[in-house]
UniProtKB/Swiss-Prot annotation:
Binding site for Zn(2+) 2: C68, C71, H89, C93
Organism: Gallus gallus
GO CC field: cytoplasm; cytosol; nucleus
SET domain ranges (all copies): 10-244
Gene Ontology molecular function terms on file: histone H3K36 methyltransferase activity; histone H3K4 trimethyltransferase activity; protein-lysine N-methyltransferase activity; RNA polymerase II complex binding; zinc ion binding
Keyword Signal applies: no
This protein's name: N-lysine methyltransferase SMYD2
Binding site for S-adenosyl-L-methionine: K20, G21, R22, H140, N209, H210, Y261, F262, F263
UniProt entry tagged with the keyword Methyltransferase: yes
Length: 436
């Protein structure tokens, strides 16, 4: 690790952040909405469910994509995108044909295979590594428990199983390190409604440390990551992004950070816990619940969130909706509707309604969610923008033009800061407004 500050082009420098290891620091002032830097993906992989609607190469969303002539499972904008993606796609093309229905490596395995291929094709430093090289990634190997090590060994076995014909592997120890690095430093690419599009490696973006009061936000333009200021940043200030969903109270956020990234956050929000009381709001009753009843309900809420996360993989929508409704009923006896655990289950219920195309049901949940979301999340939150966007599109689908108009404009106002005024998503939403 280089401990001295290394100046970089464009008003930013890598430096040794006290107590945090490496970090990124501003050398000049940045205004809200200003682009600090962009970073092309070192490598990226489109999620299987988005094949056919997004280009496997550049992730552009469009109609009429062309199929790969061999496997017929990858889709591209044109010959250029296909040629550019071939060094990566060839790892999977023949294997998908050979394995047929049995071809099912996880996205992490697919991404890691691409990293190995990229390192072989392009061993020198890339345009994605101006500040931080992939080989410098933290792995936190010493902090992995047996369960995490076992999951990594499963991934290594899958890598050998699905990719053995087209790759040379480093030894097992090196693969353990690489998978641990990917787990801590990989990014998920999402669209404007926060639907999952794929996974990618953005080395320079991974240099930024975490805060629950971030001063920048990361968005994506295809496979390009862009980092914009959501607060004014002064020269000498460290640049912080958020690694996690910021809806939840301090204890939950830090549980998540410890589990995934092996540290506890000491930002202002985690120290002062100013938002926790609102986030855990209790229903005002003549006979208020005891502290023990509240503790028990929080425990129940955390369990039901985990139960639902698992159930999503195998239960039908009707049963998933039932889990949401029953848990909301039970929690509602103690929690206010604006309590984050209530909001979590409402959001899941809204997702089920959208899936089964129950637009009215989805709208009812969304209307309950949006105000508390705006309060609990920081300014210019993608979660708030995507909720306004979903609401706007639902209103439009249900012929409520004035409400749709208003909601879509609220989404645009946030996105112009977070995504930049010229982002294709914003042009698409403006077109939706004109077309209705």
């Amino acid at each position: 690790m280089r401990s001295e500050a290394v100046p970089q082009p464009g008003g930013l420098e890598r430096f040794a952040s006290p107590g945090k290891g490496r970090g990124l620091r501003a050398l000049r002032r940045y205004a809200v909405g200003e682009l600090l830097f962009s970073c092309p993906a070192y490598t990226a992989v489109l999620t299987v469910s988005e094949r056919g609607s997004h280009c496997d190469g550049c992730f552009a969303r469009k109609e009429g994509l062309s199929k790969c002539g061999r496997c017929k499972q990858a889709f591209y904008c044109n010959v250029e995108c296909q040629k550019e993606d071939w060094p990566m796609h060839k790892l999977e093309c023949a294997a998908m044909c050979a394995f047929g229905q049995n071809w099912n490596p996880s996205e992490t395995v697919r991404l890691t295979a691409r990293i190995l291929a990229k390192q072989k094709i392009h061993p020198e430093r890339t345009q994605s590594e101006k500040l931080l090289a992939v080989k410098e990634f933290e792995s936190h190997l010493d902090k992995l428990d047996n369960e995490k090590r076992e999951l990594i060994q499963n991934d290594i076995a899958a890598l050998h199983h699905f990719y053995s014909k087209h790759m040379e592997y480093p030894d097992n120890a090196a693969l353990v390190v690489l998978f641990a690095q990917v787990n801590c430093n990989g990014f998920t690419i999402e669209d404007e409604e926060l639907s999952h599009l794929g996974s990618a490696i953005f080395p320079d973006v991974a240099l930024m440390n975490h805060s629950c009061c971030p001063n920048v936000i990361v968005t994506y333009k295809g496979t390009l990551a862009e980092v914009r200021a959501v607060k004014e940043i002064e020269p000498g200030e460290e640049v912080f992004t958020s690694y996690i969903d910021l809806l939840y109270p301090t204890e939950d956020r830090n549980d998540r950070l410890r589990d995934s990234y092996f540290f506890t956050c000491d930002c202002r929000e985690c120290t002062m816990k100013e938002k926790d009381k609102e986030k855990l709001k209790i229903r005002k009753l003549n006979d208020p619940p005891s502290a023990e009843a509240v503790r028990d309900m929080i425990k129940y809420a955390r369990n039901v969130i985990e139960e639902f996360r698992r159930a999503k993989h195998y239960k039908p929508p009707s049963e998933l909706l039932e889990i949401c409704e029953l848990s909301l009923d039970k929690m509602g006896a103690v929690f206010e509707d604006s309590n984050v655990y209530m909001l979590h289950m409402m959001y899941q219920a809204m997702g089920v309604c959208l899936y089964v195309q129950d637009w009215e049901g989805a709208l009812r949940y969304g209307q309950k969610i949006i105000r508390p979301y705006s309060k609990h999340y920081p300014s210019y939150s993608l979660n708030v923008a995507s909720m306004w966007l979903k609401l706007g599109r639902l209103y439009m689908a249900l012929e409520n033009r004035p409400a749709g108009d208003k909601a879509l404009k609220k989404a645009i106002a946030i996105m112009e800061v977070a995504h930049g005024k010229d982002h294709p998503y914003i042009s698409e939403i403006k077109k939706e407004l004109e077309d209705h």
